[in-house]
C-alpha cells in the first residue's frame, strides 16, 4: 500500500470517474477516493444519458478517450436519436441505461486500469504547503499525498435533503454528507454558495396500470454513443411510458404548498430552471390543465421505474395522493419519495480554463461543485480536469478546448468566464458553432488531439483514420462522377425530385432533400460499388457522416470562416497586462468588477456579461491593435 500518488481524485461520480481514468490512462499514478465503492458512477437522478446537447458532450467524451459512451452503450435498455426532424446539427443521442449495470460496468473498468487505485473513505481536509495543495486527509485520519488533487464532490458538500418540512443531512438519500472541505476552502479565500436540485419518486411497476399509458419504444438502428467498433443494444430493450397529470392531481399538489420547502422559505437556494419540480410547474404554469410525465425503466431485471417530470420535495402523503389521482397510478406503490437537496458549490470564475483554481495551485474542480447539473456536463469537466491534473504533474501546455472545437469547450468557457447564478445545463443554443459541433463528427474534431496527448489509444486512432479515408473516398467519388439526364431522370422523378435538364456531377444532386446516398446509389451502380467498399461494421455511420458533409458543406464552410475570425481574438492574450480600475475610458461595469476575473484573451473578455464592444475596442487600442 502506498500513500503517495501523482493525482488524487475525490469523489467517484461521473466527473470523478472520467478524471481518474484519464489521468491513469495518460500514465499518472492515480488514487480515486469514494465514500462507497458500490455507488461508483451512481445515476443519482434519472437512469438516462444524453439528450439535447448532452448527447453531443458524451460523444466528445468518447472521442477524447473517456468511458461514458462505452459504458452507456454496454448498459443501454433503450436508445433514441432526438431531433431527427431537424438538421444534423441538432441531432442528439439519448439512452436509458440499466442503473445497476452502469455502476457495475464503470467499476469493472476502473478496477482494471493500470495506474489506478481506489480507496473507500471520506475526505475532510486538504493538505497544503502555503497556497499549494499537496494531498488530502480522510475521516479515518489517513493522509495521502499527490502533485495534483481533483475535487468532484457532487451534491455531497454539506448536503441537506428536504421532504416537506423534514430535513435530512446527506449527499443522496440514505448517504452521508461531506463536511469540512467547504469550510476550509472558504477560509482560504474561495467563494462558496448554495444550489438546489431535486429528484422524483421511484415507482414499483407492479402497481402501475400500463394499459392507461402510451408506450414509447426505442429505436433499433446503428446509432450509439461510442465511436469504438463495439456491439451495442446488448441488453433487453425496454419501452418508456407516458401519461399526464390532471386537475385533480394539481388540486392535491396545491394543498401541499404550505409545506413545500420551495414555498415556505425552507429552501433559499436556486434550482435548475429547465428541470422544475412539479409544484413549481403548477404555480408557474397555473393555466395548464396537465403536464406530461414519462415513466422510465431503471433496469433490465428490476421493477423500479423513474417518474420523469414529477420531481418534488412535497410531503410524502401529498406526493402519494397526487399520483393516485392519475388513472395509471391509482394503486401506486413507491420505493422512495421525491426530495430536494441543497449543497455547496464554488463560483467557477475562480478557475482557469484548465479547471485549476486560481487561489490554490495544483487543485482542480470538476462537476456539480462548479455549479453545473447533469451527468454529461460533469463527465466532460472531469475528463478535462483529469487530463490537466496529469499535465500539471508531468509538464506540458494546459489542455483547453475552444468554443469552435467542442461543447465541452463551450461549457467550460461559459463557467469560467460568465459564472453561474443557477445550475448550468448545456443546450445547443449556448454554442455559436452548432454546425461544427455535430454529434456525428466529434471523433474528427477531437480524437487526434487526444491521441497526441497520449490519452486516446492506437486502436481508437486507427478507427478514426479508417473512417476519414472511407468518408473522403465517398465525397471524392461524388465530386468527380458525371451524371447524364437520360440515365437518371426516371429515377429522380420516382423519388419526387426534379429531373435534370443537362448533365452534372453527382455531388450536385445529393443536397436535394429527397436524395440520400443510399437511394441515389440505387440509380448509379458505380456509386453503389463505392459505398460497398466501406467497412461493413461501420458502414451506416460512415455513409451518414459523408452525406452530412456533402449536404451541409456550404453552411459548414461559412461557420468555419466565422469561427476563424473570432479565433484571431482568442490569440490576443491580455492576462495580467492591465489595471482595469485605472482605465477611465472603460465602462463603469468593466472597471468595477466585470473584468475582475482577469480574462486570458480579448475573446474571453468580450464574452463577459456587462462588457460592451466599446470596452473591447479600448483594450485593442491600448494594445496597439
Question: What annotation goes with each model-predicted range?
Answer:
Residues 430, 447-617, 621-624:
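Extended, charge-enriched "interface" segments that sit outside catalytic cores
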Residues 3-5, 139-148:
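Core beta-strand elements of the Rossmann-like FAD/NAD(P) dinucleotide-binding domain
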Residues 21-125, 140, 152-169, 176, ...:
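Conserved N-terminal/central alpha/beta ligand/cofactor-binding core
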Residues 36-38, 54, 182-320, 417-502, ...:
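An anion/pyrophosphate-binding glycine-rich loop and adjacent beta-alpha core
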Residues 10, 143-154:
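Short hydrophobic core segments
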Residues 2-15:
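Beta1/beta-strand and adjacent pyrophosphate-binding region of the FAD-binding site
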Residues 306-372, 399-413, 539-593, 598:
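A glycine-rich dinucleotide-binding beta-alpha-beta segment and adjacent secondary-structure elements
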Residues 127-143:
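Conserved beta-strand-loop-beta-strand element in the redox core of flavoprotein oxidoreductases
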